[in-house]
C-alpha cells in the first residue's frame, strides 16, 4: 500500500514539475536560483573583457528574441566570452526549448514510457530484452535494504554477495548528472563502507545497488578513476536504429563518474574506424583538451581497439529497444563484453 502511494506521489510530482517548468519565466527563475554553473558564469560575465557590456547586452537581446525565452543559456554557455558570429551564437539551443518544445515533438505521442527515466525500471527492461548490463543486487527504499524481489535483508547478507575488492555503485533510481551517486564503494577492503548508516543516504530517494564494471585496459588508461562510457546518440526511424554520433565520456582524477555535470570531458569517436577527434571538450565550463588533463592521454591518433566488433555489439544492443524516437545510450566496454549502463531520452 505504501509502495503504491509512493509511486503515485512520485508520478504526480513529476507531472506537476513538468507542467510548471513549461512556464519560461518559472523555468528561468528556478535555474537562476539553483544552477551553480549559471551563477559562476554570470559572475564571470560581469568582469568580461572579451566583449563590451553593450555588445553582450545586444547579443543577449537577439538570443532571447530568436529563441523566445530568457537568455540564460547565453550566460551558461559562456557565449559572452566567445568570439562568434551571431549566427553561430544562435546555434546554441536553450535548455528550455530542448526539454519542452523539442522533447514534446519527440515523445509527445509516446504512451509507453516504462523505463524512460528510472534506473530500476530500465534494468528490468534490459533483463527482459536480453541486454547485458551491470547486475543490480539490491534496492534501498526509504533507507531499508531490500533484495530485488522486495524482501528486506541485512548489511551482512549483502556483504556475503560481494567479493573482496569488488566495487559497487549506489545510484538514485531517478538521478541524473551523477548527482547523489556513491561510486567505487567496497564492502571488504580499500574504500570500505563498514555499515549501512555510514552511507548517509537520503531517505526520500530509492537507490539501486549495482555491481561495478571493470573496463577494458585501453579505456582504463585514459582515466582509471571512472567508468568511461560511450554516449551513443541513436535516432529511430520506422523502428530501425541509426547511430547519429558517439562521444567517449571521460571522468576526471578522483571522480568516480564520467558525467559532464561532475567535471567530465567528452571526445568524439569516428563512426567508421573508432578514432578519436583531436580535441576533447567540456560541456560545463567550456574548454578544449588535446590530452586528458590528469593522465596526459593524447587523443589525436588514438582509437578504440577492435572497433568493428565493438560497433557491431552496440548496434545489437540499440536494436532491442525501439519505443522512442531518440535515445542517448551510455555504453561501457568491459573486459569481456559490451554493456548498456543506461539510456537517456532525447
List PLM regions with ranges.
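Protein kinase-like catalytic core scaffold
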Residues: 168, 242-244, 339-341
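Intrinsically disordered, low-structural-confidence terminal and linker regions
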Residues: 1-34
